[in-house]
Each structure stands twice: as C-alpha cells, then as structure tokens.
Amino acid sequence: MKNNWVRLIAGVLVSVALVGAISLTGGMKKGSRTDGLLYEASGLHPDGQLLLVNGEAVTCEEYLYWLAYDCEYLSTYVQDIDWSAELTSGITYGDYAQTDTLETVKLYSVVRAWAEEAGITLTDEDQEALDAQRLEYVTYYGGEEAYQRQLAIQGISEEAYDHIRETAYLYQRLQDAFCTEGSALYPDGAALAQYAADNNYLTGRVVFV
C-alpha cells in the first residue's frame, strides 16, 4: 500500500509540470498508452516522449518510474514527508526529487547514446546475467504472475524495466572500453593532456613527499 501511495504522490508532483512540458515539445510523440498506476496518478501516457538527451528519447514511463523511486527513497528516511517543505535554501523535497530524477534519466540516456555511437552492445554473458537476474526476481516474488504484479505496483512495463536493467550492463561495457588499451574509446596520452589543459588540471609523473 505504501508503494502505491508513493507513486500516486509522485504522479501528483509531476503531472502539471510535465503535461506543460510535453505540450511544448512540438513533434515529440505524446503517446497513447493508458495503462499503469503512474498513468492513473499523472495522466501522462507511458509511451509519451518527455525529452531528448543526446538524441535518445526519454519516455514518461521511465521518468515517472525514477521519480517514484526517488520519492519512495525519501519517504523511507523522512517520516510523514511534506513534499512542499523546504529541504535546503529555496529547494523543496519535491524539487529535489524531480531534479535528481532528471539527472538519473540524463545519465541513462547518455550511456545508451554513447554505447550506440561506439557500437557497443550487450554480450552473451550480459544477456545470461540479465536472464539469471530475472529468474531470481520471479523466484523471489513467488512466480511469474507475482513478478508481473510487482512490476505493475512499480508502475512500469517489463519492456521498460528491461531497458533500464540493460543500460547498467552497457555502462559497464563502456567503462571497459575506456579502460582497455587499443579500444576505439581508449584515450591516448595526447587526448588526456589536452583534456587536462582545457580544464586547468596539473599533471605529473612523480610526486615526492
């Protein structure tokens, strides 16, 4: 019940702002799906495109999922949380949740865009790990139907949830590529030196103490 309440609050927090934002996005897809708890709370179509980050579309479903996640996290640590109360100077709990959510979806979108640009995809081992993880979830919740109910409580479709899970593995593959000498993403010495110069960093080979 608490999860449902949190998601309803998340929907109320964001509905007015996002409805306005989507109305300003012109040619972006507004969506047609009407399923899910977060749609009931916000009135936003899950498949509606909310924003573009590096050419990667962020759907209302993904944004609302992460917003509900943030709200649930905050409500765990702040009893009877007042979302309009000030957390810090000029920033309410509601503001913080929305800002943090935006940073999360931006990160996930950038990872997907960079992976696509670099031709990085999931490996067979990644897919096996994802399949094993799903099986763990199904077992934990007591079967396939129970797992699907849990996703419904979270207000997200399995397709969207899988998309999020896969991004974590793409992030690891990107990290591997950046750290593997000889890969297309591995920065050479000149690139690192230029980056240091552009950002006013000091570099050195040996530090004597």
Task: List each model region and its residues.
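Acidic/polar surface patches and capping/hinge elements
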Residues: T34-L37, D162, Y169-V207
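Acidic helix-start/capping segments at beta-turn-to-alpha-helix junctions
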Residues: S84-Y93, T104-K106, L122-G143
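Acidic/histidine-rich, surface-exposed loop or edge segments in extracytoplasmic proteins
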Residues: I91, V111, F208-V209
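Structured, amphipathic secondary-structure segments that form assembly/contact surfaces
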Residues: G142, Y147-Y161
